[in-house]
Amino acid sequence: MPRLTPRLPALLLALALPGVLRAQDKPPEVKFIVPAGAAATLPFSPAVRVGYMLYLAGQIGTDSTGRLVPGGIEAETRQTLTNIKRVLDANGSGMDRVVRCLVMLADIAEWGTMNGVYVTFFPGPKPARSAFGASGLALSARVEIECTATVR
């Protein structure tokens, strides 16, 4: 009678491997996030989750009524980052999970003032970031910030 014992692990691996490979090849789930009460007329999703990554659309310093907060770059930056924090928190993430930000400024000369507020929202390690001057931000905003984060 032939002895099969040494071949058994190889046989089991050969049978199981295709299923394991198929499970790993499955693309991550994509979820378009539009919170209740968000304007249905917007031509974009405020956030998109792909697997464990959360991609936020650019945020500006609007309050709950959709109006830009008064007070210039400092107030707008604070409100913008508060809006970002709200989206992150609502989607299983947080400011400590942000890995990248893109900052657009209506006037690059306001970079220092924006940065003074920005760092208060990231007291620990800072995410990777790019910043540049841009004209024509929505609602004549002074700043717009877009972020990418991981989800807990």
Regions found by a protein language model. Name each.
Residues 1-9:
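Bacterial N-terminal signal peptides that target proteins for export
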Residues 8, 12-82, 86-100, 104-152:
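N-terminal presequence-like segments and the immediate start of the first folded domain
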